[in-house]
Amino acid sequence: MNIGPDELKRFQEAADINEIAMMLGRYVTLMDQFDAKSIYEELFAKDDPEVSVEYDTCGTYRGPENTRAFMVDYFHKNLSTITRDKHGWLDFWDAGTPHIVVAEDGLTAQATWSL
């Protein structure tokens, strides 16, 4: 079976989209654990000067330092009083409507979800 360059590009884009979707699953798991530091360390391109995070109710934070500071500060300010063992909790994450666009060069992507 010969796979041409166009088909190979389509397969790679599909694999990239799947990997990004799997990252969202990891994000939800880490949110359940209130682990903002790991969210930043594991899921953000922390060595990229253009890294950013945007939450509709909190604004946009650009650059590695601002992105990390937001993640850690947000969790500390908003979730530090919540018990970590979650005894008696019923967690439900509705993470849907994914929109993942891989750049033409395949080097970057942008993604949004309704959470």
Residue ranges of model-derived segments:
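A solvent-exposed, acidic/Ser-Thr-rich amphipathic alpha-helical stretch
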Residues: 37-114
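Short, low-complexity N-terminal intrinsically disordered segments enriched in polar/charged residues
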Residues: 1-38, 42-46
